[in-house]
Amino acid sequence: MSKAFHSIGLIGKPHHSGTHKTLKRLHHWLTMQSYDVYVEERVAAEIGPQVKSVDLLQIGEYCDLAIVVGGDGNMLGAARVLARFDIGVIGVNRGNLGFLTDLPPDTFEEALGKVLQGEYETEHRFLLESEVHRHGEMKSSNTAVNEAVLHPGKIAHMIEFEVYIDDKFMYSQRADGMIVSTPTGSTAYSLSAGGAILTPNLEALILVPMFPHTLSCRPIVVDACSIIKLVVSPDNGDALEVSCDGHVTLPVLPGDEIIVRRSKERLRLIHPKGYNYFHVLRNKLGWGSKLF
């Protein structure tokens, strides 16, 4: 049987016993099948001195498949880097929910074996690009797979800002913040804040206010081509933040403008054959099964 992939990168959560165990099994299993295996440097030492230790960028350059062992947080961290490369990404779930990690940690061999033989489905997920502008100059930027969140930082309190869609004024807002989410992120922070679930194939963004001081403000879904602009009131007394996937923080000052748009980068997710998004939702969210 011909191989669908040849060079494979292993990524995982450092200093986590469950992840360490699965990574060692994966490395041995893949090496015995003559795959060229690279291991992210943060976890390479835990597997042994004989492994090929590389960073995430090198995995993107050298490999045609990356296997992420951990939870969705680990997948998000890897995805923000790997999305710029032509590499497939699949996850082994060692976290809690695992919306993005399909393979079971203790019995991954059968499903992964079929994937490596070419029995898989490919799904492309777009990312967000967030920029902070100050006095007409971009001060910082980063990407997000799930969401970009404008918020006050460590202490929750109400902030004031204006929201523009494609330079058209939508409304002013007094709230604890604003979540701008992709369909991928619609089952994460956005869902907890009352946002709708968007199926991954939708080219759309959802804006979810956080605890707005009004009874009429609701989440709104806009086209993914839209450019979202959040203008922070100069009267806000404290420095704010834009959080990308909860991992990367961009500092924001009163009067700054935050631009959020769809990134040109797309994550190429690999799923086992027969993957069903609604089956994942039922399992993870406790929905009822079929009645007949």
Swiss-Prot record:
Its main location: cytoplasm. Its EC number is 2.7.1.23. Keywords: ATP-binding, Cytoplasm, Kinase, NAD, NADP, Nucleotide-binding, Transferase. NAD(+) binds at D72, G73, N146, E147, H157, R174, D176, T187, A188, Y189, S190, L191, S192. It is an enzyme of class 2 (transferase). GO terms for molecular function: ATP binding; metal ion binding; NAD binding; NAD+ kinase activity. It holds the Pfam family NAD_kinase. It is found in: Cytoplasm. SUPFAM superfamilies: NAD kinase/diacylglycerol kinase-like. It catalyses: NAD(+) + ATP = ADP + NADP(+) + H(+). The active site is at D72. GO terms for cellular component: cytoplasm. GO terms for biological process: NAD metabolic process; NADP biosynthetic process. Its cofactor is a divalent metal cation. The keyword Cell inner membrane does not apply. Involved in the regulation of the intracellular balance of NAD and NADP, and is a key enzyme in the biosynthesis of NADP. Catalyzes specifically the phosphorylation on 2'-hydroxyl of the adenosine moiety of NAD to yield NADP. HAMAP family: NAD_kinase. Belongs to the NAD kinase family. This is NAD kinase. It comes from Shewanella loihica (strain ATCC BAA-1088 / PV-4). The gene is nadK.
